[in-house]
Amino acid sequence: MRQLNYYIFISTILTYNLTHGQGPRPVIRVGITAALKTENGSIGWAYTGGAVPLALQYLKSHGYMLNFDFEFHVEYTECDLANTVRAGLNFMKTNNYDVIIGPPCAPALKMMGTLSTIYKKPVLGWGFVSESEISDMNRFPFVASVLPSTKTLGVVTSKLLEIYGWDRVALLYFKNELDYCSSVVNDVEKSLYNESKSVQIVMKAEIDGSNSESTSATLQVVKTRARVILFCAHAGGEKRFYLIQAGLLGMNSSEYVHVMLSMRSVGFGVQTSVGKKPLTLSGLPPIWESFTVNPDGMEDLAKSVAAKMIVIDTSSEVRDKTFLQYMTKNIVYAIREPPLSCKVPECLITNATGMGAYARHLFDVFYMYGMAVSSLNSTDPNVYGNLSLLIPKFTTAFEGMTGEVKLNEDLARKPLYQVYGLNSEYDQISLIDISLINDTVNVVFNYADGNTEVWHFWGGTRPPDTPVCGFLGKSCPLPIFEQYRALVIVAIAVTILILLAIIICMSSKIRNRRVEQSRLHSEWQIHAIKLRLPMHRRASKSSQESETESASETENFTSKSGDTMTSEFKETYTIQYLENDLVLTTAHQVQELSQAEMMKFVKLRKLDHENLNKFIGLSIDGSRFVSVWKMCSRGSLQDIISKGSFSMDYFFMFCMIRDIAEGLHYIHKSFLRHHGNLRSATCLVNDSWQVKLADFGLQFLQDEEEKPFKKNMLWAAPEVIRGSLSIEQMDSSADIYSFAIVASEILTKREAWDLSRRKEGYEEIKYAVKKGGQFVLRPDLHIDIEVNQTLLALVKDCWCENPEERPSAENVCKVLFDMTPNTEDNLMDHVFSMLEEYTSSLEVEVGERTKELTLEKKKSDILLGRMLPKQVAERLKAGQAVEPESFDLVTVFFSDLVKFTDLASKCSPFQVVNLLNDVFSNFDSIIEKHDVYKVESIGDGFLCVSGLPNRNGMEHIRQIVGMSLCFMEFCRNFRIPHLPRERVELRVGINSGPCVAGVVGLSMPRYCLFGDTVNTASRMESNGKPSMIHMSEAAHSLLVNNYPYQFETNSRGEVIIKGKGVMETYWLLGKMSLSNQSTPPITKVNHKPRKIASFTDSELTNYSFRSVSPYVENLSDNDDEEIRRVLRREMMRVEV
């Protein structure tokens, strides 16, 4: 491209003001590197260069630079690095200019900044120069810019997402020749990963502003993944293009939030001289207007999307809006006039309108320099380019055309961001001010009620990042009226239609089933009836014989796989019989199978390799799909490693690692292309200690399943953990990473990542692997035996952070083949020699296991005694059946913590558990003091009974009543540590009557109660009141008849009880003192003597002896003489 340059001199250079007797005025020489034909709408010199003379005019109108003249030299480098170097040398070395206005693009400015460190010349930055590297004072100490770093934009974006609770976002950006938005988005993405652990970028895509079809396709994908969309556009046309495309796809509903990322201080505005009604805050026309000669009629559509948009931008509040409008209209004319007098064709376009996006930044950076030089008040030419003198002046705040401008010590603009929205009049308003001071984020809210001032276009509610009805809108239930409206309107007609539909559907279903069954009779389909558990192998045998044979049939597997298997293996696989062979089965959820998926089963069954576990088939005619695999009797590799009792030397480890690599290589060459779930739990070991890979090729059956083991992610590659790949998108490199983790387990003889010895937990490890970075986290390779160092290097290469740098499975196999030890023994011979050594230590281990078994038996006996009555537990241990037992009269107790749900809502889960533990532990202590059996506790409820399993005559009613009063006394005194003002209240129900008790179930047997007595006791509790003991009439009669004058009760009256009708019930108020007892008449006719020998000393002390004189005369001869003497003496003392 032809290089253009020219010199412009102000006419007053080297002139003398003879009137005032002054010498020639100082001349400041300014070198300008501009772009004439690059990004005209943003940094094009014809649309931005006029900002320099306008800034000079503005300076002089405010009393600055009155005694200075300027010499301008412009070179059009077009952001080319070579041209930039040539221009920089010309400015700094050859002509020794005072100050350089740098190129308006980051790579070229960094080159110019490098030259400035050599020649010590200040460089002023504007345009696309927000990259974080430019603000590095160590690299570019002479570069000053009026734009903040894009790194700060990322921090502000992360803070906004945190404020509004959005964790799931999409990230879109427009591409242009300078890759401005690409650099912005990259810095924002890094900040989101560093600042927030919860934000997930579900999609990151580039938008072509010239291709509406590709943009529409991209937005269609966004609609299925996100509702909060972050996007970056560098020009006003791109912003309006995005709004129109989003509106055409219906993304202007209340579900969507569009967040525009900007650093140009324009907010919702566009820098142009054409416009209808400018925005009040920025003085710029809104982005939804059409600025072409022939409007496209899309203003309303774009406006509807803009209403659902918020903007993160540097402060755009311009104080002098009059001059801004003047600048917008005259900038293209100012460049044609002195002092610049641009005469190139681009500057002389007669119909040119509008102002470049970064013209205001060019204005501010030159205005900042002019103020700094003026404030020095010196005519010494050496100070004009002395940055050490200018820096203190640069850091002085001033009001420019981009709002308030103030530079920090790094000569980058102190970021003052504002979150903009639109009010009900579609005028721009500032919602939030966010500033960064010393790495501290300061947030100032400019609204009082977010629902009315922020989210009014969203229906007054902040939209979530995930819609209630799902991203496809299929999760919302239909309203009941819509479901049954046809039945209400045409009931008779619908009935007839239903009958016809049933007949048609049944006929069609029968026909389709026959066709489907005939089509599915293939080699991979296994009928569910052919699969059976080992204990049901022969139904003709007796139960005891069947159990004996089942034990012998599975003895081989148990002895080889070990006494214990991991819970994951038990959850994943079930051992069953297929005909007469043991197989491994895995259950899957039922789903519709396509023709392609069924053909995949045929291909899976044909896969045959010595290091792949054979896929036998799939059962699809049961309640769940069941995949059937060949039996590997030694269990999984995870079982062998976790057990830790089998010694593995280097040859053994090497053979296992080689087997895994060979199996993985075969899968990668097959139609599967990847395993997708390689872990030590999916590496099975057969009789010959040969490792076989399993659980491959069926991921599409597991997509809808809940994964019970979250620690499976410990084997997943970083790109998989980040969620950027679906199962279909995974490739072989992710398997290579998982292979490295499994190999580390084998070499270290410890489970993945050795969590028991690491200070990091699962979540910390997962986050560190997901985050990546320069220093990545990987398992430790602490090996206690001598191994080939090449093998360790291979493992480290396989878990490389970059998937492209990981070796392929084929290369791994080649390296392992070259490392094969020189020995003629095979693995089985090696295993036999190891077993011979192992046998010598077997006796010692058997003795230790016997001791452990005895100890565990004692523990199990204690635990069983706590779960079941002693006599029941002994019968169960002896293998005897426990027959149900009937009890004529028992007392049943039910209790419930009142409003426990409300109380639990004020506590954390750990506090709830601790609260229940404190309360129920004290309840258990109270129960131990009474002849009461605790049946069970369910949640916050208690069920107890007295009178069974040990019969105690009529004592059961007194034991239950006494225990209930103790419960109430404890609740009155109990205080919740973390909620001292809250009280625990108990509601108790008591009933007496017959009952049947017995042990129910084989797995986790429980001692259960049956009978209407239990139901009535439950009704007493549910119909009671807080801190009250509610008794049925049966319990009350039993209490007052057998223990009169010992407990105080009160009739509640008749109450309607569910399932019982009207019942008269009673309140138990407490123990009755002698002062509260009814005094019987003093008469000896038909008097029945009454004993009080059962009273305790504490009770006698608390009684008022003024009311017991009538009882003294009624004592029988059989009463304790000592009690009579004490009572008489005390009564005489009181009367005196």
Swiss-Prot record:
Glycosylation sites: 40, 194, 252, 351, 377, 386, 438
Residues in the Cytoplasmic compartment per record: 507-1136
GO CC, any one term: plasma membrane
Signal sequence bounds: 1-21
EC supergroup of this enzyme: lyase
A biological process term (GO) from this entry: chemosensory behavior
Segments forming a coiled coil: none
Membrane topology: Single-pass type I membrane protein
Pfam families: ANF_receptor, Guanylate_cyc, PK_Tyr_Ser-Thr
Catalytic activity annotation: GTP = 3',5'-cyclic GMP + diphosphate
Tissue: Expression is biased toward ASE right (ASER) sensory neuron.
Transmembrane segments: 486-506
SMART domains according to UniProt: CYCc
Keywords: Cell membrane, cGMP biosynthesis, Chemotaxis, Glycoprotein, GTP-binding, Lyase, Membrane, Nucleotide-binding, Receptor, Signal, Transmembrane, Transmembrane helix
Domain Protein kinase: 533-833
EC number: 4.6.1.2
Extracellular compartment segments: 22-485
GO MF terms, alphabetically ordered: ATP binding; GTP binding; guanylate cyclase activity; peptide receptor activity; protein kinase activity
Region of interest (Disordered), ranges: 536-565
All copies of domain Guanylate cyclase, residue ranges: 891-1021
Top-rank taxon: Eukaryota
Location of the protein in the cell: Cell membrane
Free-text note on domains in this protein's UniProt record: The protein kinase domain is predicted to be catalytically inactive.
Family note: Belongs to the adenylyl cyclase class-4/guanylyl cyclase family.
Cited function: Guanylate cyclase involved in the production of the second messenger cGMP. Regulates chemotaxis responses toward Br(1-) and I(1-) salt ions in ASE right (ASER) sensory neuron.
Name of this chain's protein: Receptor-type guanylate cyclase gcy-4
Lineage: Eukaryota, Metazoa, Ecdysozoa, Nematoda, Chromadorea
Gene transcribed to yield this protein: gcy-4
